């Protein structure tokens, strides 16, 4: 399953495409809108995806919609320092 897709007229607009296929080789440029949607799947039990709608602004990924994560559901011991820093910066916005 891909990790995201473009946003536009179609449900899965291209480019960009965040996956292993050829479309994923297209560089994300300023003003492109796309999703970042990592997922976790536990075979035979469940799957969950967190989708964040974003756009590229001056070479930096910016969220279109801002909703904080429920921190009590995050196991911070599984995050590296860069991930913790990103989460803290995201929460401040």
Segments predicted by a language model, with ranges:
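Charged, cofactor-coupling segments
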Residues: 2-4, 10-93
